[in-house]
Design a protein with these regions (language model features):
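Long, intrinsically disordered, low-complexity segments
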Residues: 23-24, 81-82, 111-114, 187, ...
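Conserved, well-structured interaction surfaces
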Residues: 44-45, 49-53, 57-63, 84-158, ...
Length: 525
């Protein structure tokens, strides 16, 4: 493709094919001569390539990465002090409960839609309908990768969820029991094994943005890291650094990783493709109407966001300052430093005057998100409130993240001296001093925590990091004053705190529990 440029026209047919007809045959028995019935589809390579494109859409739609995952999950991190706005922000302030927040029920089925579409492709493709082995491997590799991707977010957001690896053929299979996280992670690894062996190392320009063998290795290595299988994580992540051509962008282009400039670049290991849409309809599964650029309102400043926005907490800025890191600081946090600019190149203090005044009224520092906030899209008055016309790709895994995950896996495998050079590659790009090679395991662990703040804040990793490091209670619990003497969610009040045994996971959506009595609610909800 370039995947984002023609994704939507190509997937229209496949999306309509996957729509379930809710009409009873006794009520309506009319055939649509323009419709494509499933028996008439999946006949050749072109059909399967269309099906692959349709498989991506639930992930990029507004009900998942197009918007909902940001306010529903990623903004729970300690970086963001959320200004409350009705039910829209209760999940990002750690106050969400079934019945008083919207987003969990939106995200959950999107992931299973992608899994269903991947299962259909895997089951229907064969040597007869796609005789070309290379083409068949490309199609299957993408299906296995996206099924693993969807299951990765299911297990890390909800924990005990159904593991659906085939299309249902019996009534019993329509009501699956939850699987253990161990079984889900094993299935993720198995699918990524298939993806690694089938996907190409790179795609032609017209298909840039599709997952590659490097994408699959990186996600498999990440899965091993999260499940504490450190030696396996090292093997996979090191292979990404040795057998592929990924590189860090130079310091002068660091912020290209978060704008519409230079998408699918040499640092991108896997990124979701977005195309700005003029005709937006909330929640639809029709390409061109239900996908937003990255729904930038969740990263825009308070006086530009219709949901009241948020502020960056001062302890995040302090990590940059302690390390002398201005390259990543200036690309991550918008605030009043010499030469700081706002939207469209307007001086920061002029462009952010109302936001700065609001910070003063709230008694907090005037620090704002810069990544994915659309600063390069024009002056503030030209920025669409919903962001649907922007079309900024979201970089799911960057090479810098691979280097830091590799360093972490090596350090956890008691090899701090081997870990440090990989951290220093990331620091060198940021033009800051290298770490001493004599640091011990505990010191390297803290260095990785800090480095991930400087490199990855605002990209959707921090909350997952805090949970897997067992730091979420320390940083977000009721006793935390890490944010300049305040709780990181102080603007939402005293109930906006992390609760151990509950907030590690989201709740299973109530409609899913009502539809399937075999499911059970997560602890604390």
């Amino acid at each position: 493709m370039k995947l984002k440029n023609n994704f939507y026209l190509l997937t229209m047919l496949m999306t309509l094919l996957f729509v379930v007809n809710g009409c009873n045959e006794d009520q309506l028995d009319l055939s649509n001569p323009n419709a494509v019935a499933e028996p008439d589809f999946f006949q050749n390579e072109d059909d399967f390539r269309l099906a692959v494109n349709g498989m991506f859409h639930p992930i990029t739609a507004v009900l998942f990465w197009g918007r909902v995952i940001h306010t529903g999950a990623l903004l729970r991190s300690d970086a963001f002090n959320i200004v409350p706005f009705q039910q829209n922000t209760t999940m990002s302030t750690l106050e969400g409960q079934p019945g008083i927040a919207r987003w969990s029920s939106d995200m959950f089925p999107q992931l299973y839609q992608t899994i269903f579409r991947a299962n259909t492709i895997i089951e229907k493709i064969n040597e007869e309908n796609v005789p070309n082995e290379a083409a068949r491997n490309e199609i299957l590799g993408q299906a296995y990768f996206m099924r693993a991707f969807a299951n990765w977010y299911l297990v890390n957001l909800w924990g005990n969820v159904p593991l659906v690896l085939k299309t249902p053929t019996t009534n019993e299979e329509l009501f699956p029991f939850p699987a253990s996280p161990a079984d889900i992670n094993a299935a993720i690894i198995s699918d990524l094994n298939e993806a690694v062996n089938r996907l190409p190392n790179s795609w032609a320009e017209e298909d840039s943005g599709r997952p590659t063998a490097g994408s699959a290795l990186a996600l498999r290595g990440k899965t091993f890291l999260y499940t504490k299988s450190y030696a396996n994580a090292v093997n996979d992540l090191r292979t990404v650094t040795t057998d592929f051509s990924y590189q860090l962008l130079p310091a002068s282009q660091y912020d290209d990783n978060f704008t519409t400039v230079n998408e699918n670049n040499i640092e991108s290991v896997f990124e979701l493709q977005f195309l700005g849409q003029a005709n937006f309809i909330w929640g639809t599964d029709i390409p061109g109407t239900g996908t937003q650029g990255h729904y930038f309102i969740d990263y825009s400043p308070p006086n530009l966001s219709p949901d009241n926005g948020h502020f960056i907490n001062p302890h995040i800025l302090q990590v940059f300052e302690d390390n002398g890191d201005t390259v990543r600081r200036n690309a991550t946090i918008a605030f009043d430093y010499p030469g700081a600019l706002g939207y469209g190149g307007v001086p920061f203090t002029e462009d952010f005057a109302d936001d700065i005044a609001e910070a003063g009224q709230l008694g907090i520092p005037a620090l704002f998100t810069k990544k994915y906030a659309g600063f390069d899209e024009g002056v503030r008055d030209q920025i669409p409130v919903l962001g649907n016309t922007i079309g900024n790709n979201w970089r799911i895994i960057r090479y810098a993240d691979v280097l830091l995950m590799l360093a972490e896996a090596l350090n956890e495998d008691n090899k701090p001296a081997e870990a440090i050079p990989f951290i220093n590659q990331v620091r060198e790009r940021a033009q800051i001093a290298p770490l001493a090679l004599t640091l011990d395991k505990t010191q390297v662990e803290q260095a990785i925590i800090n480095e991930r703040i400087m490199e990855l804040t605002g990209e959707g990793h921090r909350f997952f990091d805090l949970v897997r490091w067992d730091l979420a209670d320390d940083v977000l619990g009721s006793g935390s004053t890490i944010a300049g003497g305040r709780h990181p969610k102080s603007l939402a009040g005293p109930t906006a705190v992390f609760t151990v045994g509950q907030d590690e996971l989201l709740w299973i959506p109530v409609p899913e529990l009502q539809a399937n009595s075999n499911l059970r609610q997560n602890d604390g909800y």
